[in-house]
Structures are given as C-alpha cells and as structure tokens.
Amino acid sequence: SWASIDYFGRWKALHYYEKRFFAPVLISCHEEGILSQNTNVNAEPFGLKKSAHLNVSNETMQKFRGKAKWSLRRPDASVIEEGSFDVTVPALSAVWLPEQDFSNYGTYDTYYSYQLLDEAGNVVGEGSVLFCAPKHFRFADPELNAFVKDDDIIVTAKGYARSVEIQAGADVVLSDNYFDMDGGVKAVKILRGSVDNVSVRSVWDIR
C-alpha cells in the first residue's frame, strides 16, 4: 500500500523520511546536476552546471540560530572542500544560503553533504545529494557494521553510505533509519520493540 505505517503501527521507510522532511526546523538542498538539466543519455556534450543551494526553514514560533556545515566529498567520504554558514531564521520563515558552484569537479565521483547544528551544537538535520542519477554514481563499499549497545544500535561506516537501512525486527521502531553517513559512527535509539539480531545495508548493496 501507499501507507507509511502498516496495519500494526510499524514504520515503513517512508515514515522515517517523513519524520525528517516534516521537521519543524529543516535544512534542505536544491542541487543542480544531470537530472535537473538533461536526462537524455544520447545528448551532445554540454557544459553541466553542478551546484548546491541550501535552504533552512523554521516553522516554529521562535527565532532559530545555528550553523550549516557542508562538505564536498569522494565516495570514500574523504573531504575535497568544506565550510560552514552562520544561520539565523526568524519564526515562521525560511532563508536561502549562498549557492555554491562545483562545476569543475567530477560528476560521478563527488557528492555534497550538509548538516544543521543549533547553538548548543546539537544536530538538527542532515543529508547528502548527488550530481548524477544514483545508479551512475561510483559508490565504494562503506563496510557497514552494526551492533546493539544498551538502548542504542551503533552503526559504523568507513565510507559514504547512502540510505542506510537498519534491520532489527519487524516490530522495532527506531529514532532514525534510511539515513546517509559520511563514514564514522552513528548511534540510533531503540524506541520500541526487542532487538534479537541486527543487520545493516545501504544503496551499495543494491547490485
């Protein structure tokens, strides 16, 4: 069905995405690349614009202040460029940050990652975008691993992992799932259900 929650109240992939894109304070990215300019595989060569344009929307009644961090990375998550923007968004408003051009970098082997932090340094939102269709991106094996520690599932990655899926049982609800990782470690809270066994996979495994 098209529902994001099944008959028993269990979360499907869409519901985890909905939790993110309906966040009261949201960071999102409008990327320019192949899919926004020309999807014809037989097209004559042309100058492809590759850019990222971050937006922060604030649907709360309070002013939001924080920092938007960004990085341009390779498939192994190593950094090519990085930086940040100070962000102030009035209540019930949205702010566009400066557009960034990456036309001089590779189309199939670079990706753009972004993260929004509040004044206390807490992660409010994050994500990543590609400049080509995912099936054409040169993903590297992120060497994902996951294990249970107390009330958390700890996920580790050695490279870029897109749409990381934690499988921990049909009745388990987590604080996050189907997320992107720039390598490193991420702790995901077990909100409901009992975890007997845990496995993890990403877009890399769709082959």
Question: Which ranges hold each PLM region?
Answer:
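Carbohydrate-binding surfaces of carbohydrate-active enzymes
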Residues: 1-175, 181-191, 197
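Generic C-terminus detector
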Residues: 195-207
